[in-house]
Structures are given as C-alpha cells and as structure tokens.
Amino acid sequence: MKALLDLFKQVQQEEIFDAIKIGLASPDKIRSWSFGEVKKPETINYRTFKPERDGLFCAKIFGPIKDYECLCGKYKRLKHRGVICEKCGVEVTLAKVRRERMGHIELASPVAHIWFLKSLPSRLGMVLDMTLRDIERVLYFEAYVVIDPGMTPLKARQIMTEEDYYNKVEEYGDEFRAEMGAEGVRELLRSINIDEQVETLRTELKNTGSEAKIKKYAKRLKVLEAFQRSGIKPDWMILEVLPVLPPELRPLVPLDGGRFATSDLNDLYRRVINRNNRLKRLLELKAPEIIVRNEKRMLQEAVDSLLDNGRRGKAMTGANKRPLKSLADMIKGKGGRFRQNLLGKRVDYSGRSVIVVGPTLKLHQCGLPKLMALELFKPFIFNKLEVMGVATTIKAAKKEVENQTPVVWDILEEVIREHPVMLNRAPTLHRLGIQAFEPVLIEGKAIQLHPLVCAAFNADFDGDQMAVHVPLSLEAQMEARTLMLASNNVLFPANGDPSIVPSQDIVLGLYYATREAINGKGEGLSFTGVSEVIRAYENKEVELASRVNVRITEMVRNEDTSEGAPQFVPKISLYATTVGRAILSEILPPGLPFSVLNKPLKKKEISRLINTAFRKCGLRATVVFADQLMQSGFRLATRAGISICVDDMLVPTQKETIVGDAAKKVKEYDRQYMSGLVTAQERYNNVVDIWSATSEAVGKAMMEQLSTEPVIDRDGNETRQESFNSIYMMADSGARGSAVQIRQLAGMRGLMAKPDGSIIETPITANFREGLNVLQYFISTHGARKGLADTALKTANSGYLTRRLVDVTQDLVVVEDDCGTSNGVAMKALVEGGEVVEALRDRILGRVAASDVVNPETQETLYEAGALLDETAVEDIERLGIDEVRVRTALTCETRYGLCASCYGRDLGRGSLVNVGEAVGVIAAQSIGEPGTQLTMRTFHIGGAASRAAVASSVEAKSNGTVRFTASMRYVTNAKGEQIVISRSGEALITDDIGRERERHKIPYGATLLQLDGAAIKAGTQLATWDPLTRPIITEYGGTVKFENVEEGVTVAKQIDDVTGLSTLVVIDVKRRGSQAAKSVRPQVKLLDANGDEVKIPGTEHAVQIGFQVGALITVKDGQQVQVGEVLARIPTESQKTRDITGGLPRVAELFEARSPKDAGILAEVTGTVSFGKDTKGKQRLVITDLEGNQHEFLIAKEKQVLVHDGQVVNKGEMIVDGPADPHDILRLQGIEALSRYIVDEVQDVYRLQGVKINDKHIEVIVRQMLRRVQIVDNGDTRFIPGEQVERSDMLDENDRMIAEDKRPATYDNILLGITKASLSTDSFISAASFQETTRVLTEAAIMGKRDDLRGLKENVIVGRLIPAGTGLAFHKARKAKEQSDRERFDQIAAEEAFEFGTPSAPAEEPQHPAE
C-alpha cells in the first residue's frame, strides 16, 4: 500500500529547457500566477493556529496545511483529491503546493518599482529622459509633472511645484494636465511611442558630434530598443498588482512559550496590506487630497521596503531595531540565494574527521573508520541485507545495522569493495583538492591519508580535517574511478610537474642513503650483485655511504620490436657507486637506467626522477615506483636516526672579524657624512648596503664551515668532504629549512624592516644560537608581527582573486578538436638581465606548432604545423639551437564560445593533448589562484629579515662571443676618453659565431662602456659600469653653462647640510613652490659657444636645453665650462625600500583587473620623427610627425623623463615617456600578441620571485577572457550601435550572417576588460548576478528581456542541469542530436501525412523552451 501512496506523491518529470528568459511581468501576468487576492494583514489565529481567511497564510488561496485534508476537516484522504470544500473553500491536494502557489495584492494606487527607479543608472530616468531627482519628487508627491501641455507654452515632462501648479491652473484653466505620484509617471510611460523615439534617436546619433550626447543617446537607444525587441511595455515598471510569495517560502513557526518566529517578509507584506487597505478606505470616503497623498506616499515606501529595504531613505526596522530583510536581500551577497543555496549546497552521504598518516596504504587507498563507513554506506547495506535474506524488511535491516551484528560488518566489507569515496580538504583551491580513493576499513575514528597525496591537498597532520563523500550512482562511481582516483592524478594541472613527490622524512632518508663518504667502512670492495651488497650491509661489513663497485642489472627497452619479443631486456653493467644507491636500485621500474639513482637524491632530483619515470615508463609503473620510494625513504630515515642539537649550529670563526670590519666601514661613512662628502640619503644607502653584504658574507662563511668537514682518506691524507652535519643535511636535501633559516640560526639575523617597509640601518648581528639581547629581540618583533598580520590579509585577498578568476573563465571549455587557424605567437627563451630565466624548451613544451619547425642547417621540416611538441621534440629543437618557434595559443583560437584542443595543447594534468569537454577556463583560474596564498602582499621574506639584493652596478658577459649594440644605443666620448651612454633604452647583445643571440643586457643612461660594438670577449668580461645610487644628467654637447630659471627660493633651494655646513642646489617640487608664476617654470641649462651664442642641436634651429628634474642636485656652477659627456646634475635614487613597488598579490590583481597605472608611460601613437614644440605651463610639448606629414602632439608633465630626443625616429607603440606601461595602450598600439606577452611576463615575474611554476597557457586563457568583448566602430547593417560593447563570438556570428546576406558587416576594435568587469558584462545574466552587484544585473536583464542560453558552467549549476563540460558536454551533445533527429522524423511523418491527405504542410517551427 505504501508504494501505491508514493506513486501519487511522485514529482512529475522536470521539463527540459535550453534557455531561461527574464522579463518584466505585466499586471495581467501577475494576476494569472495568483491563486487569489490577499486582503487582510492577519497571518494565523494564534489560539487555533489555523491560518486566517484572506490573510497572508490563507489556506483557500495557497493550499491546505496537511496533505489531502481541507481546513475544516470535512474532506480527508486521497479519494477527495481535487475537491474544493464548500465550507472553507480549500482545495484538497498536497500541502507542498504552499511552496508554489502565489497570491496577489491589488494596489489602490500604482507604485513605482524601486529597482528601476533607484538602481543606477535609473532605468525610469533613461526611458523618460528625466533626472532621477525629478522623478523622485513626482513619485513621492513633492511636485507635479506635466503630462499633456495642450495649447499652453508648458512642455511635457516639465516639473512644477504645487504653488506653480495652482498658479498655472488659474492662468490656463483645464487646458493642460499635470499629475503627481506614480499615476503621473505611468501616464508618461504610456504616452511614449517607442518606435518613433528609436527612429529619432538613430538619426540624432548620426548627426550629433558631441561625445557626451553620443554616449547619452546610445544608452537610451539601447534601453528603448530592448523594449522594442522584447515586447515589454515600459509602464510595467510601475506596479498595479503586487505578487505575494508562497507562504512556505516565508514561514511562520510557533516557538515553545506561545511566541512565533517569522520571516521578515511577513512584516513587510503586513505593512503594505495595512497601508493599502487604509488607502482604499480613504479613497472611498473621498478624504482630503493631502491625507490621501500622504497615504499613497506611505504605500510607495512600504512597497519599496518590501522589494529592497534600505535602497531609499532609512531602512524599515523590526521590533529590535534591526533592518528587515527584504526580497532583494534574500538573493544577493554571500548569504543570498545564489551563493549560499544554489552554488554551495550541502550534500548527503558525507562525513568529516581528523586525518592521520597512513604510510602502509597504497597510493589509491585511504583508511576509513568503520563507524563512518557504516553510516555512509547504510542504504547499500540495507539493500544487501534484504537481497541476502538476512532481513525481511528495511525496518528489520535497520535494526540489524543499529545492533552492529557481525553479519553487518561482513556485508560492509563487501559493499565498499571497488566503491571509491571522494576525499576533500578545505580550502579546495585546485582540482587536486578533491580526489577519489578506495576505502580500507580501519579501527579508530580518524581517516588515514597516504603521505604522498599530502602535497596535492596541502594537508599536514597537525589536526587537519577532511570530508568524505560517497558517489552513489553507477556513473558517478565510474567517473570517480577513472577520472578522480588519486593514482590517475599524479601531475599538477598548473605546470605538469609530478604532484606525488616525497617530502620531509622521505627525502631525508633517500638523501642520507645516497650520499657518499670518503673512507667509509668497506670502501673499494667489489660485489657481484645487489643481493651480496645487502648481505654485506646487514652484517655491518659496509656502511650505507661507502664507495663500492657493484654489478647491477637494468631492464632496458628492447630494440627488437617484433611480435612476441619482450618489451624490456636485462642488461648487466659494473657501476662505481655507494652501498645505499645499490640497495635502492632494487626498486627501479623497468625502462629507467641506474644512472638516475647514481647521485645524491635531493628533493629536486627526486621530483625529476618521478617525472622521468612518468614520461618513460607510464602511469602505472610510476605510481608503484613512487610508493616504493616512499616506503624506502621512511625505512631509511628511521635507520639513519638523524637528529639535531645546539652544537650542530656552528657559528663561523670569522664572524667577529667580518662584523668588525663592517662596523669600521660604517664609521668611515659617518665620518665622510660629518665632513660633508656624502648626503644623509647616500650615507643611509651605503650603510644598508654594507650590512646586507656583511650578512651575506657571514652566511657564506657559515655555510662553508657547515657544508664540509675534514676527513682522513684511505691513504691517510687529510681532505675535506661534504659534511654529514644533521642541520646541513636537512637543508641541503630539501627536507626542511633553507640556507636563510640556517643563517639566522648560526650566522647573523641581519637587517630588519620597519612595518612601512623601510630598512632599519642597525642590523641584528647576533644569531639564535648565541641569543638576542633585549634591543635586538625588540627590533625583530616588528617583522614577525607584520608577517602574521600579512598572512591573515593574504588568505582573504587570494581567495577573492581566485573567485574573480573563476568567474571570468568559467564558461571556457574545449569544444572542438581543431579550429583550423594558422595564427599563433612566436615563442623565444625569456631573458632577463642577461640570464635565461625560462628556456625555450619549457615555454613550448606541450604546445602545438603553428608553422613548420625547420632545421636551420639543412632547411628540412622537422615538425609540421599542427604537431604537438613533446619532450623529444623540444630536446631536438634545443639541440639544433632554434631560438624561435611559432606555437598555437588560446588567444588566437577561432572557436566561438569555447576553445579548440589544438590551440590549447597538452592537458598538463594528464600529459597528453587536452580532451574535448575539459573546463580549461576553471583549471587556468585555479592554477593562478591556488599559489596566491604563497605570494606576498608586499615583498616580505624570512621573518621580516630584509633581503634586499645589493644593487647592480655593472654588467658582465656570461658567455664568450661578440658584443653587438642595438640601434637605440647612443654614447659620447668625454674628455677622459671614456664612452658615456646617453640612450635610455640601449641594449648590448652577445652573439655566438653563427650570429645567434646568446644574451642581452640593458645598459642604463649614464653608464661607462668598457667594450664597444664588435669586440670579441670572453665570459666574465665587464661590459659597462655605473653608479647605482644616483642617476646622472649628462650633456651631449660642450660649452659654457648658462642657467635659466635657476632661482634660489623659487625653483631651487640651497640645502645646507646641518652636519657639514656645505651647500648644494636642489630643484624643489612644483607643489612646494610659493608663487603661481614659479609653478610653470622649469629650471634648465643652455650652453653657449665661444662667441656667446646658444649652442643649437645640429641640423635644427632648436637650442640645446637640458632640464633638471625635481630632486636633482646640481653639480655645475653658472658660467662653468663643460665638456661633452660631463655630469651636470645627479638625482639620488629612491631610498632603498624593500624590492618591488607593488609586488605579489596586489600586482597580479592589478594586471588582471587591467588597471591603468598612475603616471603611466606614454607610447608613440604613430611611427614618425620626434620634435619638441612650444612648452605650455607646467607641460612640455612633444610632436611626432608621421610619414604622411601629419603632426601628433603629446603634452608631458615637466618632471617626467622623456626617453627620446629631437630628431629621433620612433615606431608606433614605442615608449617615449618613462613610466609603467598601460595595458590598454599596448593593446591599442601594438596588438593582442604584445599585450599577451606583457601580461604573461609580468604575472610570471611575480610568481617566479616566489619560486612558483605556472604554465603560460593558463595566463593566456585568462587574457583571452579579458579580450572577449569588442567595441563596435562602424555598425554596417548589423543590429549593433556604434560604440557598443558586444561579445566577440556574438559579433562574429552577426558578421557572418551579414556577409551571407550580402550586407555590410560591422568593424570593431579590441578592448581589454578587467576580470571583474568582464565577469559582470558576460552575456549570461545568471552568472553575472551570482557574481557581484546582483540587483543591478537583474534589473538590466529584466528590462532587456534577456535570454540566458546556459552556455557556462555556473548558470547550469544554478538551474540544476549537468554542466556542459566533461561527461556533461557529451550528454548535452547527445541530447541535442537526439532532439534534432526526432524533430526531423516528426517533420517527415507530418509531411507524409500531409501528402496523403493533400493538405499543405505548415513549416514546423523550432521549439525553443525558455522557462519563464
């Protein structure tokens, strides 16, 4: 019987839909939803607890309280289903209809919807072309608005006060109509003829020239056209009927003690109904206008509060002075419907517990406590018990399980076999934060986790908790097993490195076992095989680190690949190795040579080893190998018995002398400062430099002492060998600690920074072993506290960055195999400061070649365009010395609404070409966001110890070759015969014999060149030197100095050093100059020749002018003779703050938000010749004359540093004024490729500084999403408006349609949007609304009558469909294909029938299913 009853309760099949449309509801629509009008404010009768009739919980309107039972109890049971009781008027049906049925309130006077009024920009204002202020005055009964001016000189939509109105009425009588309140506004809205307005606006747009007007008209046109298209009437923005939410969604719950807990909405609705009823009565009584007006205003306010409390005026508050939660508050923000309930659901069949280490598990297993498993797998156990006949009913089975009879445990074992569970550790920052494992039942209450997966989960065992989830359906189990099993996820999706790398004790054990010692016990013995070595070791005849000769059997790939031949064949060779390494060779997988183990295994080496194993031996062998490495590591670490004590921290003997020398040097600088040879700033810079160098020196001495130890070799001579000091071994192996930390233990702590980032010039000379005195301890607390405060901030910021990144990329999925484009970007090795920071091989690995890769010597094609470049390919390319390869990239992919596999390349987490359906957008966002917490908020390192690199003051060549200067390098020779650089962007290249570039160095302005163009040099030769602490201003011409505008007290100040009494002239800041006149002048030097005439720039009429920047110390006197290349002034560089202006996270966020930097550098808009025009006040005028002879002017603030000189030819997009680059300019002037290179390099710089590896393609994916909108320049015959921003795919589709119809397509400019902006401007309103600014997004979407095609992942999660990625993409594709074939079959049948009966067949319309 129970089963029968359930039949009636079953939910009817959910309708299938492909899109969701949002719009404004007309009053009739609202009435059609409603099941009755709510007339009374009463809720329930508090004596009988029954709902009041016609009240907010009325059973007649909303449905019965109990299933199949009317209110008065006349009809009960199923047999009366659908009957409406004549006594109480309640329909007999399920009680759950109270969640679906709506009511309505007929408003006595229309009311404006606050969202369309107050959500900026005000939509009502746009449609009516009135200001928000005016509309508000009309709505809240402070002013009249003219509706129909008739024959009077008044204008429609004119605002007039009450006084005005009465005067006009006396003057014109009833010739004109003016109203106040929502009725007036509704009249105005009704009187708008949309078609006519759209026509006028379009013509106005074509004819007007003013920017402001174009913007205004375009906005208004967009809204009106949306009304036109969607068929929504503007007057629906004014409500006549108010819908009432179903009562179960705003429940009223009786608490014990006769009180009630209620949803705030009920209070808000009660207020509306009360005021509405009072207004009805007043209108019936024909009350005085002023009373009615006041009541109408109060009604308007009540409805405002219901819809969005606090949006206008004071928020309505409940009894406890707390603002009531309105409908808008229900859906927005972190606790709102979208983020709390739709995107973050709690799930059944899950549990959480503390994790402990499980070293005995296999990689794909986890230990699950028995009691947890019993609870999680309950339904499966019930089923099994029934099937086996242990229990007859589910109830009996339940009892069995509760009593935990022995049979239950046996069945549990059976149930969980082959049934994976998913483990998740919060925060889940990337894909590897959830992995599937096969459960192994264990006693106790903690989950056991395999040590090697800790790195992926970022878990440790200091009390971390993890959650377990059970995949229920067969499909879910299959996906968990094939896609999520831990042993299938051995690579990080961020960079393709192995994620199952050993750490800590495992590393220490392996390192200890593979070290070699001189003169160990049994050194020089020879063994016939590994088993002999093991026997000797077990009998203590040899030590682990002794050098011995062993015959080792390796399994190598078989050359003979014929049918039936074994894949691997044994190969025996004699190796000189150590006992430990020989023993480890037992676990080598077939296919790996012994040479990979024949070295001390540090952490990096082990990682490389596992990587090699993965590439050569495949996934299964690697997983087994990693497991065995782990077992060996733990065993060996235990046997090694490494521990540390105070005496292990050796304080270097030279420390005293090094520190003493430094103190002497500092004293010397103090003396120079006192006698006025250096400025205070220079002194500070130098002192800080000395101490950081000292800190380094002590550290170095300490490491040298720690890292080697004396030892007697076999011949009895003393030599040194690498130390077996425990602390040193821990750091050297990479198990724990770093050189910097050891330096603080046994060297000196060094310089500390104040909270503002400036460095305290007195260092802490003590270390932790000697102990700090009170003052030193006090100084060091600064840095330590700041570190803690930073960490807390950092986590939140990093999480927010990840959220924005995921939001902008969530709809990017691989949807096809190849888009067929031949575009790509040229990849080169990344060189910085002459060093190769990232080799070409790392940048192109796993990419698809965009054009053929050609051997430079033989010109034959090595790899064709479209080939995936794997490890062997990049090794070939590197070996042949090819220095540039064009590869496909996500940025140039031509797939619409997605990406193609070829443009993306290798899926780094799997090591093969990416599959169709992979959600590469989300993976990119996770890869960039996950290491976010490791980035700094500013640059802050070890315990606040200031780690400022001593500033570079020279460059030297790293390799042999020939010096070449770039075209922009210019220099002059001064009187001493030195070559002084006067170009700002010159670079020196070192090329090898074939002319290939080996390294490249920037040579700064004012440097002295030591090698000239064409010089052949050896590695280590200095190319140029310069003073790192000041920046000079140098003259390119000789002559007599003549100062202009150098007036003491006006533009320059005499700085007399308090200590030394010497004076220098310093240029003072414009803002600090007194008179207005002085603000516009710029102190400068002109040069006079022997005749007293101004020296001119050769070939022009311009006199030489050399301007001084603010802060420059002028080093020449008026009338002094100067030679070419002499220094006129020096600008001290900024005081040494800790490196990096905006470093770390804020910098990454700044780049992805595409913010224009303040004081950005200026790029040349065109290619042409530079000249300087007439200066205006405070600005200098720079003119570029392009090739056609047109002039382009730039006004540049005087204090800016101009990088070009008169007569120089610049290319479009070249930097002409120094400063940080503006990404928008780069995109506009240099194109997408340059922009992508800029953003990728800048983001990578930040991560590289922290030693985080992220593949470039992830950043490119984000950049693609930032470029996904374009701005229409000329709309052609399309439906777009010039200046409108539209989705790129949308515009390309429209253009294709135009070309197909022989019409004019639109032209467009690329625009760059920051990630927040891009997320909000996505076509999917559901996704945008769930991100930020919910109200604004929904308001706009409703007016536009937007349709969401559910393309992204987020929208689909929210509406509860399978996401269109991974297996879900296949599902949707199959469903669409089936619908298509069904439709065709249906059409065919219809056509046949029509043919039989001879009726003309109507064309079948495509059924779209927008769910309203």
UniProtKB/Swiss-Prot annotation:
Single Gene Ontology BP annotation: DNA-templated transcription
Binding positions for Zn(2+) 2 per the UniProt entry: C819, C893, C900, C903
InterPro entries named among the record's database cross-references: DNA-dir_RpoC_beta_prime (IPR045867), DNA-dir_RpoC_beta_prime_bact (IPR012754), RNA_pol_asu (IPR000722), RNA_pol_N (IPR006592), RNA_pol_Rpb1_1 (IPR007080), RNA_pol_Rpb1_3 (IPR007066), RNA_pol_Rpb1_3_sf (IPR042102), RNA_pol_Rpb1_4 (IPR007083)
Keyword terms of this UniProt record: DNA-directed RNA polymerase, Magnesium, Metal-binding, Nucleotidyltransferase, Transcription, Transferase, Zinc
Ranges for region Disordered: 1393-1412
Binding residues for Zn(2+) 1: C70, C72, C85, C88
Catalytic reaction(s) noted: RNA(n) + a ribonucleoside 5'-triphosphate = RNA(n+1) + diphosphate
Subunit structure, as described in the record: The RNAP catalytic core consists of 2 alpha, 1 beta, 1 beta' and 1 omega subunit. When a sigma factor is associated with the core the holoenzyme is formed, which can initiate transcription.
Family: Belongs to the RNA polymerase beta' chain family.
Job of this protein: DNA-dependent RNA polymerase catalyzes the transcription of DNA into RNA using the four ribonucleoside triphosphates as substrates.
Record protein name field: DNA-directed RNA polymerase subunit beta'
Species the sequence originates in: Burkholderia pseudomallei (strain K96243)
Gene this chain is encoded by: rpoC
